[in-house]
A protein has these predicted regions:
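Short, Lys/Arg-rich flexible segments
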Residues: 1-117
């Protein structure tokens, strides 16, 4: 075998870049799903929708760093904490926590589907 017959190819960086890209897309899709589920959770007892302001304020963002991708589901409505955690006179409606906890298997499946290709 001569040197001309021997070829080594390195695809490490390209492979890692592709995995990072897929992970970022997967987290974006999972974040959109979680945002939707959080809005739906407000319909569950104890239901507290008057104007829809809280529901309409729920959004998601993502943070992407090498090897670390995060979806953040949040609201900027000042009374959201009282609805979520409850008060002395009002039972909690943990719409954010429930949106995450009740759908973990779906989020996992979304992420796996993007990374398995």
């Amino acid at each position: 075998m001569s040197v001309a017959d021997f070829n080594i190819e390195y695809h490490g960086k390209d492979f890692i870049d592709e995995i990072e890209r897929r992970a970022a897309v997967a987290i974006e899709v999972a974040g959109m799903k979680a945002e939707g589920y959080a809005k739906l959770e407000l319909e569950n007892p104890p239901r507290r929708i008057d104007t829809g302001r809280l529901r309409n304020s729920i959004t998601h963002t993502t943070e992407d760093k090498p090897g670390e991708h995060t979806a953040i589901i949040s609201t900027n409505v000042e009374y959201a904490g009282y609805v979520h955690e409850g008060t002395v006179r009002m039972a909690p409606n943990r719409f954010l926590k429930n949106a995450i906890d009740r759908n973990k298997a779906e989020y996992k499946a979304i992420i796996e589907s993007f990374l398995d290709h």
